[in-house]
Amino acid sequence: MAVEKTNSSSSLAEVIDRILDKGIVVDAWVRVSLVGIELLAIEARIVIASVETYLKYAEAVGLTQSAAVPA
């Protein structure tokens, strides 16, 4: 995936539109320790995308499989 460079500035609306179109994932892991004792651990994965973009990529990796309905 190539990074596109332009000389013109982008408006906030264009940036938000691009993020929703392509999607962005923030994966964070934080651990707070004091004298070797873990006090707090936080793991987070934040996905920012439009519903259409999320469903397209989630289907590709098998996250949208529906539960079978008994007949």
Swiss-Prot record:
Subcellular location: Gas vesicle shell
Disulfide bonds: none
Domain of life: Bacteria
Pfam families attached to this UniProt entry: Gas_vesicle (PF00741)
Alphabetically ordered keywords of this record: Gas vesicle
InterPro entries for the chain: Gas-vesicle_GvpA-like, Gas_vesicle_GvpA, GvpA, GvpA-like_CS
Keyword Iron-sulfur: no
Description of how the protein assembles with itself and partners: The gas vesicle shell is 2 nm thick and consists of a single layer of this protein. It forms helical ribs nearly perpendicular to the long axis of the vesicle.
HAMAP family in alphabetical order: Gas_vesicle_A
Protein's name in the database: Gas vesicle protein A
Species whose genome carries this gene: Microchaete diplosiphon
Lineage: Bacteria, Bacillati, Cyanobacteriota, Cyanophyceae, Nostocales
